[in-house]
UniProtKB/Swiss-Prot annotation:
Belongs to the AB hydrolase superfamily. Hydrolase RutD family. This is Putative carbamate hydrolase RutD. Involved in pyrimidine catabolism. May facilitate the hydrolysis of carbamate, a reaction that can also occur spontaneously. NCBIfam families: RutD.
Length: 266
């Protein structure tokens, strides 16, 4: 699996791995790259079955497989220890990495994640699946911003959203791959295993997230032994895109604090 690695800003700089959500594209993290690359070696990637890592995914594709293939790619690149920043599905992959490779994952940042899919989130995905079946890729792509962004943010950026729609349609991961990745997301359940995650965790959520209720992050915070929760008052599901200034400050402070906390505990 292809990875994109930034040059380390100094010798032995900590590594931060960015894992996007269901869309799978590493470019999702563009608003974070410039600030992160000043302090960390940053790893981005298109998830298997998407972008520049095309593949046909098995029907039983799982979050555990997503975590294993990423860890193997990191080891092949010579990376033994890394912090993980995961958004939604990416946060699930991050938790799986922390469970399966505890010696490797130094810190986990969960952005609008959950222990197991909430009934409201499941309802949203049911609507989106019906759109996919009835209207194809175009209907899926056109509806997606409604679940990602606040209404006023979208209204002020209509030309940008039209361009993003065209790009997303041109690089659509395919109906079968999308549904298999979505099914992996829906099957994931960390409610009985989260207390085994020992790395420090920062939980970031947005209070106006239409797709994932903030209660999901509260449940995560209660279940994870060493966690802190930060709530952004605005930003929607893709809060790192819509309010990068606020998000980046939380992310940078969280990474620095948790990495220091971990080193002090060793």
């Amino acid at each position: 699996m292809k990875l994109s690695l930034s040059p380390p800003p100094y010798a032995d700089a900590p590594v931060v791995v960015l894992i996007s959500g269901l869309g799978g594209s590493g470019s999702y993290w563009l608003p974070q790259l410039a600030v992160l690359e000043q302090e960390y070696q940053v790893v981005c990637y298109d998830q298997r079955g998407t972008g520049n890592n095309p593949d046909t995914l098995a029907e039983d594709y799982s979050i555990a497989q997503m975590a294993a293939e990423l860890h193997q790619a990191l080891v092949a690149a010579g990376i033994e220890h890394y912090a993980v920043v995961g958004h939604a599905l990416g946060a699930l992959v991050g938790m799986q990495l922390a469970l399966d490779y505890p010696a490797s994952v130094t810190v986990l940042i969960s952005v609008n994640g959950w222990l197991r899919i909430n009934a409201h989130t499941r309802r949203c995905f049911q609507v989106r699946e019906r759109l996919l079946y009835s209207g194809g890729a175009q209907a899926w792509v056109e509806a997606q911003p409604l679940f990602l962004y606040p209404a006023d943010w979208m209204a002020a950026r209509a030309p940008r959203l039209e361009a993003e729609d065209a790009l997303a349609l041109a690089h659509f991961q395919g109906k079968n791959n999308l549904l298999r990745r979505l099914n992996a997301l829906k099957r994931a359940d960390f409610s009985h295993h989260a207390d085994r995650i020992r790395c420090p965790v920062q939980i970031i959520c947005a209070s106006d997230d239409l797709l994932v209720p903030t209660a999901c992050s509260s449940e995560l915070h209660a279940a994870l032994p060493d966690s802190q929760k930060m709530v952004m008052p605005y930003g929607g599901h893709a809060c790192n895109v819509t309010d990068p200034e606020t998000f980046n400050a939380l992310l940078l402070n969280g990474l620095a604090s948790l990495l220091h906390h971990r080193e002090a505990a060793l």
